[in-house]
UniProtKB/Swiss-Prot annotation:
Pfam families reported for this sequence: PapZ_C (PF22740), RapZ-like_N (PF03668)
Residues that coordinate or bind GTP: 70-73
InterPro entries found in the cross-reference section: P-loop_NTPase, RapZ-like, RapZ-like_N, RapZ_C
Protein name per UniProt: Nucleotide-binding protein Sare_3328
Stated family: Belongs to the RapZ-like family.
């Protein structure tokens, strides 16, 4: 295709998947196939533009194409950033998905399957992970979506990707409301963090202690507390007020994290209610309860 062609009027949906080794790229690739994407694994960065143009020309199922890339050389980050920039200059609007996980989680995953890290060489596993993170820094900065798989199993990761890309309109801003426990750490990919610990804790109500915020009893208790309604309404208005700006800036995915002490009662109830209210507006919203079952 001649240089400078404008492809902005095409309906090709292009996804670029990269991330750390052991993070779950293969699971992401399979999930994208499940929702109708034509997936090309281990594609060299130099062929990204050619692949995008072929997908546009081919039409049909190939119009939804995903390219999965991993670190193959020390020039990876520079090459990928340049390739993404070229795609945008040629009129494509790729979604860039970066799959990540905590170092400790990656080490456990490699040790559980008795594999060495591809960049480990003669050094330690942690050394290979550190080298790869350095090479991927520029690629991570380009990401529209950062999927942290530290606390996701294979099925949860698959569902997360299907929620993101299963709809035909893959360019719309999507919101995931994540409940979590502060004692387990704040989700690293959060755009907004809401602290629900000002509400009375159902843990101290004997008949509610063993139930979660997904139950009617706990939800009614939490949402009926003084300040709960104003809290949910304020964050609903805040998120609704920012979505148009995020979309103008090209942001595709928004993570709203709602925390309480352990991530079982208050944060879960608030997250469910917040997602429900956002879903009644123009926003596509879903929930993820990161720390349920960890206590």
């Amino acid at each position: 295709m001649p240089s400078g062609s404008d492809l902005s009027d095409t309906d090709t949906t292009l996804v670029v998947v990269t991330g750390v080794s052991g993070g779950g790229r293969s699971t992401v690739a399979r999930a994208l196939e499940n929702v109708g994407y034509y997936v090309v694994d281990n594609l060299p960065q130099a062929l990204m533009l050619d692949m995008a143009e072929l997908a546009m020309k081919a039409g049909g199922a190939a119009r939804r194409t995903a390219m999965v890339l991993d670190v193959r050389s020390r020039a990876f980050s520079t090459d990928l950033v340049g390739a993404i920039r070229e795609l945008k200059e040629r009129g494509f609007a790729p979604w860039v998905v970066f799959v990540d996980a905590d170092d400790e989680v990656l080490i456990r995953r490699f040790e559980s399957v008795r594999r060495s890290h591809p960049l480990q060489g003669e050094g330690r596993l942690a050394d290979g992970i550190a080298v790869e993170r350095g090479l991927l820094e520029g690629a991570r900065d380009q990401a529209d979506v950062i999927v942290d798989t530290s606390h996701l199993n294979v099925n949860q990761l698959r569902r997360r990707i299907e929620e993101l890309f299963g709809a035909e309109d893959a360019r719309r801003l999507r919101v995931t409301v994540v409940s979590f426990g502060f004692k387990y750490g704040v989700p690293p990919d959060a755009d907004f963090v809401c602290d629900a610990r000002f509400l009375p804790n159902p843990y101290w109500v004997p008949e509610l202690r063993e139930h979660t915020g997904q139950t009617e009893a706990v939800s009614s208790y939490v949402l009926g507390q003084e300040g709960a309604e104003a809290f949910v309404a304020t964050y609903t208005d805040l998120i609704n007020a920012t979505t148009a700006g995020f979309e103008r800036e090209g942001k595709r995915y928004l993570t709203v994290a709602v925390g309480c002490t352990g991530g079982k009662h208050r944060s879960v109830a608030i997250a469910e209610e917040l997602a429900a209210r956002l879903g009644r507006t123009v926003i596509a919203a879903n929930t993820q309860h990161r720390d349920l079952g960890r206590e």
